[in-house]
Amino acid sequence: MRERLLAAEKVTAIRWQGGALHLLDQRLLPSEERWLACDNVAQVAAAIRDMAVRGASAIGIAAAYGLVLALEERLAEGGDWEMDLEDDFLTLAEARPTAANLFWALNRMRERLLCLRPEEDVLAALEAEAVAIHDSDREANLTMAQQGIELIRRHQGNAQALLTFGNAGALASGGFGTALGVIRAGYLEGMVERVYAGETRPWLQGSRLTGWELANEGIPVTLCADSALAHLMKTKGITWVVVGADCIAANGDMAGKIGTYQLAVSAMHHGVRFMVVAPSTSIDLNLATGEDIPLEERDADEWLDFGGTPVSPGVEVFNPVFDVTPADLIDVIVTERGIVERPDAAKLAQLVCRKRLH
């Protein structure tokens, strides 16, 4: 299965080449494929903040490489690079406050600096750590894809119609994707007949990005208005909703793209199973419940301009980027460490704190 998954991979969003970070500008997709070359930390932070790169895992990976660029700058300046680098940690951390993977990646990079041996080259060590973060995310996605599709097969063995929301594919990660990784694996195994994708306003990650990814691989995909998704569950024989996560609290509450919560409510009402696919790095045991997850809000301009035409001048806008889906609406969380059905605090703590022999 792993070899087939790798052979099917066609999309990548992050490249580290020649000492620079190259990001596929996702604001322009699908009409234009343009790569941004970032050679300093300010450019990386701007790319994260302005959503040229997005998706929790991809943000964390980009931030790790951003710290490598920051360190290179600080060393060239010749001052107290350890103290100066703290400003760069803060700059990156503030770029997107909801993504748990961002803070996980920054903390892992900080820990690597703290563990440096006197004889080590600090820049080479930090670069190697960023590459390791990138590689491990891709491997985690491959593992989750296989686990997720086996779970779907266990519940129902024939080809099915799945619903996804937002974009949790290769564009949102180090490669292959989380939710879309499961869907890709399912299609290769003959378990997925059709994928329905919600448009995901206001940035249209579903119609612009998920639709583009799946169509590129020949996977049958139908785009739907966000307002049609409950009707879709009622009429189209959907068996699973499969989504990614930006942050998972200790009790299993999950922050996802705005609209995910109402999707979970509809799924519960219609008897459709709800699967969250996310690496264990998205779980933050320091956040007791979803109420503790900081939820980003963005500028009103994202709603007040439609194709260059002003919309309702003078109105106020509520523009949250994420909402919280309570754990009791989630049937299963799939991670690279294992599957948690009917998630709660005890199960997630056991998953995250489980000791490994290798």
Curated annotation (Swiss-Prot):
Catalyzes the interconversion of methylthioribose-1-phosphate (MTR-1-P) into methylthioribulose-1-phosphate (MTRu-1-P). Its EC number is 5.3.1.23. InterPro entries: IF-2B-related, IF-M1Pi, IF_2B-like_C, Initiation_fac_2B_a/b/d, M1Pi_N, NagB/RpiA_transferase-like. The active site is at D246 (proton donor). GO terms for molecular function: S-methyl-5-thioribose-1-phosphate isomerase activity. This is Methylthioribose-1-phosphate isomerase. NCBIfam families: eIF-2B_rel (TIGR00524), PRK05720.1 (NF004326), salvage_mtnA (TIGR00512). GO terms for biological process: L-methionine salvage from methylthioadenosine. It holds the Pfam family IF-2B. It catalyses: 5-(methylsulfanyl)-alpha-D-ribose 1-phosphate = 5-(methylsulfanyl)-D-ribulose 1-phosphate. Substrate binds at R54, G55, A56, R96, Q205, G256, K257. It comes from Pseudomonas putida (strain ATCC 47054 / DSM 6125 / CFBP 8728 / NCIMB 11950 / KT2440). SUPFAM superfamilies: NagB/RpiA/CoA transferase-like (SSF100950). The gene is mtnA. Keywords: Amino-acid biosynthesis, Isomerase, Methionine biosynthesis. It is an enzyme of class 5 (isomerase).
